[in-house]
Amino acid sequence: MSDKYYRSAYMNVDLNAVASNFKVFSTLHPNKTVMAVVKANAYGLGSVKVARHLMENGATFFAVATLDEAIELRMHGITAKILVLGVLPAKDIDKAIQHRVALTVPSKQWLKEAIKNISGEQEKKLWLHIKLDTGMGRLGIKDTKTYQEVIEIIQQYEQLVFEGVFTHFACADEPGDMTTEQYQRFKDMVNEAIKPEYIHCQNSAGSLLMDCQFCNAIRPGISLYGYYPSEYVQQKVKVHLKPSVQLIANVVQTKTLQAGESVSYGATYTATDPTTIALLPIGYADGYLRIMQGSFVNVNGHQCEVIGRVCMDQTIVKVPDQVKAGDSVILIDNHRESPQSVEVVAEKQHTINYEVLCNLSRRLPRIYHDGDQRFVTNELLK
């Protein structure tokens, strides 16, 4: 990936904040493996740089959603353990073995198909984590009998390693009894068979709110990057997480709308008086969505309104007269109390902070900050 970029919109990623959040989880669960979830390009931050920095700060295990994501990490020198949380097509099983990637077993049928697709040329081990469906209703085995049968099948093959068992909480970030019920169901099922090396069930919310002594690994995702899974979790815990992302654009042009003149598609904004506007080279193709019309951005310390429709590549802001081309504009801030925090943006978009981060597209350069050091990743100029 290139260390150059040629546009006036980019993300700032604070790697020290990510490392600090990782340490929070290591401290909360000192006897557990912190399985850092870096799927979805590390929730938009950039999986390679994030994983590399986390390894330098003690991470030994990563989780991703797809084999492609795992191979990307391997291609960039990430040697730690990697678990694919999603379902790999059975025909691609040799690729997982080749790249030393652990896989999720979602069903007995999948395991049988996977075994059929292991070529005779493969002599390396295949690590497997069995997924139990304790209430999420998505992937996983729902009954103890099938779980035991899957373990028995794995044990018949010297090449296969029953490395882990896990489940996923549906409502850990909300009040109620469901998470406790899921945890109990998980323990009951796991206790009916031999135990593997890794037993894990806690996502970010579960890791922040629950002890789960039965388990020896946790899977924090969103909170590694400094964000609470919900307002409920933020209010319940005393743990301080450091937000790690800023979205910045520099003004490329200013101009004056006269009274009666409109701007952007649909002419949804018409000036009633002479109005100075600033054009920002960022739009919904970058993840700054059309619904952000009417929201506010930070221009030189001033809260300035986004006017007119947000375009694919441009956003228009009503600004003070003294604003000029080149001035920096904060669209997403890394301060929790900021009017541009990820949570405020998520509320404006009628969504959750996860989606705001994951929407930040690959065409945005990522500028990584590690103390005084600065690194640039531009995925478009590989």
Swiss-Prot record:
GO biological process: what's one of them?
Answer: D-alanine biosynthetic process
* Gene3D superfamilies the record matches: Alanine racemase (3.20.20.10), Lyase, Ornithine Decarboxylase, Chain A, domain 1 (2.40.37.10)
Residue ranges that the Swiss-Prot or TrEMBL entry lists as coiled coil: none
Q: Which residues are reported to carry the modification N6-(pyridoxal phosphate)lysine?
A: K39
Give TM segment ranges: none
- Catalyses which reaction(s): L-alanine = D-alanine
Cellular-component GO terms for this entry: cytosol
Q: Which residues bind substrate?
A: R138, M312
Q: EC number(s) on record? A: 5.1.1.1
- Recite the UniProt keywords alphabetically: Isomerase, Pyridoxal phosphate
Q: Which cofactor does it need?
A: pyridoxal 5'-phosphate
Top EC class for this record: isomerase
Record Pfam families: Ala_racemase_C, Ala_racemase_N
Q: Name one GO molecular function term.
A: alanine racemase activity
Q: In which pathway does it act?
A: Amino-acid biosynthesis; D-alanine biosynthesis; D-alanine from L-alanine: step 1/1
Q: Which domain of life is it from?
A: Bacteria
Q: Which residues are named in the active-site annotation? A: K39 (proton acceptor), Y265 (proton acceptor)
Q: Which HAMAP family match?
A: Ala_racemase
Quaternary structure annotation from Swiss-Prot or TrEMBL:
Homodimer.
Family membership noted in the UniProt record = Belongs to the alanine racemase family.
| Reported function | Catalyzes the interconversion of L-alanine and D-alanine. May also act on other amino acids.
Please state what the protein is called: Alanine racemase 1
Q: Which organism is it from?
A: Staphylococcus aureus (strain COL)
